[in-house]
UniProtKB/Swiss-Prot annotation:
The protein's name in its UniProt record: Serine O-succinyltransferase
A Pfam family: Abhydrolase_1
Enzyme Commission code(s) on record: 2.3.1.-, 2.3.1.46
Catalysed reaction, written as an equation: succinyl-CoA + L-serine = O-succinyl-L-serine + CoA; L-homoserine + succinyl-CoA = O-succinyl-L-homoserine + CoA
Site residues (Important for acyl-CoA specificity), renumbered to this chain: R186
Length: 380
C-alpha cells in the first residue's frame, strides 16, 4: 500500500472523530492541499479548486514545489485563474492516495493500512472535508468554487451542504448525478481490478500487486475520457512499425492500442487500487435528487428531481462548461446544472464547447476552456 504525496503538500487535520455520510467514522484524518497567491486582508479573494478522481493537490508550480502541476496552463500569474489576483487553494479528495486520508493510509487504531476497512466514501464526505479546509484557512466565503469532473460533483455537494460558502461557481465537465452509462463503465473498471488475483480482497503489496486489473481499468477510463473524433484524428488506422509488432496476431498492432497500453502502464503504479475503488463508487452513489424537497419520482420527467435538488443551492453566479464530445459526463449534464441553479435564483450560464478532446478537454484544450474561465472570473 503506497501513498503518492507531492513535495510541498500541506495538511489539514479534520475533526476527530469524523462521521461519514454512509456510516462509520474516521479518526485523525487529514486533507492534503496546496495554495498559490496571497489572501487579501478581508479574505475575500479566495478560489477553491476541487478535482477529478486521480489528481493530487499540485495543480500548478508554486514556491513549495516548482514542478509543473496537472493544471499548469490554467493556474498562475496572468493565467485564467490569475494568482496575482486570487488566493487559490486546491484540495486532494478525501479517500485519495495523494496525501488525504484514504484506504492506503494508516488506520491509527491498528497501525496498518485501512484497505477495505475504510468506511464507505461519498462525494458528500469529500465535500465536507474540503469545506473544513476553507474554514481552517479563515475564509468565510470563497469568491469562486471551481470543480472539474468528479470535482464538479464535489462542488455541488459543497454548495448544497454549506450554504453561503461561495459567491460564484464554475462547474467544468461535472454532473449532478451519475448516469447509467458512467456507472456501467466504472463498474467494469472495478470488476477488472477485483478479478485480478493479486488484488486478493484488497490485501496486495508492491510485489503481489493487481497490475493487470489496474491496467485494464485505466484503459477503459481513457477510452471514455476522449472522443471518437479525437481517436480518428490522432491515430486513424495507422499501424505500428513492423519491428514493434508482436508475433501474436492478437497483440498490439495499431497505434491506438499502443497508446492505451503506454498510458495505462504509466498510471498503474501511481494510484492505489483500493482508493480507485472507493472514489469510483462514490461517484456512482452521487445524486442531487436526494436533496429535492419532494423525492417522489416523476415518471414523466425523471430529471425533475435533479433540477429540484440543484434549485436548493443558493449562489449569485455560476458557469457550467462542457465539451460537446464528452461521453462520460455528457454536455447535457452541464446544461442541466445551469438550468437547476437558475431555478434556485442564480445568474447561471451554460457553455458547450466544440472541443474534440471529450471529457478530458478541460485538461488539454486550454485555447477553449481558458478564455471561458478567465472571462467569468473577471466579473467576480
Amino acid at each position: 500500500m503506497t501513498e503518492f504525496i507531492p513535495t510541498g503538500t500541506r495538511f489539514h487535520a479534520l475533526p476527530s472523530p469524523l462521521p461519514m455520510k454512509r456510516g462509520g467514522v474516521l479518526h485523525q484524518a487529514r486533507v492534503a492541499y496546496e495554495t498559490w497567491g496571497t489572501l487579501d486582508a478581508d479574505h475575500g479573494n479566495a478560489v477553491l479548486i476541487v478535482t477529478g478522481l486521480s489528481p493530487n493537490a499540485h495543480a500548478a508550480a508554486n514556491a513549495d514545489n516548482p514542478e509543473p502541476g496537472w493544471w499548469e496552463a490554467m493556474v498562475g500569474p496572468g493565467k485564467p485563474i490569475d494568482t496575482d489576483r486570487w488566493f487559490v487553494v486546491c484540495v486532494n479528495s478525501l479517500g485519495s492516495c495523494k496525501g488525504s486520508t484514504g484506504p492506503a493510509s494508516i488506520d491509527p487504531a491498528t497501525g496498518a493500512p485501512y484497505r477495505l476497512s475504510f468506511p464507505e466514501l461519498s462525494i458528500e464526505d469529500v465535500a465536507d472535508a474540503a469545506a473544513d479546509v476553507v474554514r481552517a484557512l479563515g475564509i468565510a466565503q470563497l469568491a469562486c468554487l471551481i470543480g472539474n469532473s468528479m470535482g464538479g460533483m464535489t462542488a455541488l455537494a459543497l454548495l448544497l451542504r454549506h450554504p453561503g460558502i461561495a459567491r460564484s461557481h464554475i462547474n467544468i465537465s461535472g454532473s449532478a448525478q451519475a448516469l447509467p452509462f458512467s456507472i456501467a463503465i466504472r463498474s467494469l473498471q472495478r470488476e477488472a481490478i477485483r478479478l485480478d488475483p493479486h488484488w486478493n480482497g484488497g490485501h496486495y503489496d508492491d510485489v503481489q500487486y493487481p497490475e493487470s486489473g489496474m491496467r485494464m481499468a485505466r484503459k477503459l477510463g481513457v477510452i471514455t475520457y476522449r472522443s471518437a473524433l479525437e481517436w480518428d484524428g490522432r491515430f486513424g488506422r495507422v499501424r505500428l512499425d513492423s519491428e514493434l509488432t508482436a508475433e501474436d496476431p492478437f497483440g498490439l498492432e495499431f497505434q491506438v492500442e499502443s497508446y492505451l497500453e503506454g498510458h495505462a502502464r504509466r498510471f498503474v503504479r501511481f494510484f492505489d487500487p483500493n482508493c480507485y475503488l472507493y472514489l469510483s463508487r462514490s461517484m456512482d452513489w452521487f445524486d442531487l435528487a436526494e436533496y429535492a424537497p419532494d423525492t417522489r419520482a416523476d415518471a414523466a420527467a425523471p430529471e425533475s428531481g435533479v433540477l429540484a435538488g440543484l434549485a436548493q443551492i443558493r449562489i449569485a453566479r455560476a458557469l457550467a462548461i462542457g465539451a460537446n464530445t464528452d461521453i462520460l459526463f455528457p454536455v447535457q449534464q452541464q446544461e442541466q446544472i445551469a438550468e437547476g441553479l437558475r431555478a434556485g435564483g442564480a445568474d447561471a450560464q451554460f457553455l458547450g464547447l466544440d472541443s474534440p478532446q471529450g471529457h478530458d478537454a478541460f485538461l488539454v484544450d486550454f485555447a477553449r476552456f481558458g478564455p471561458a474561465v478567465r472571462a467569468f472570473l473577471a466579473d467576480c
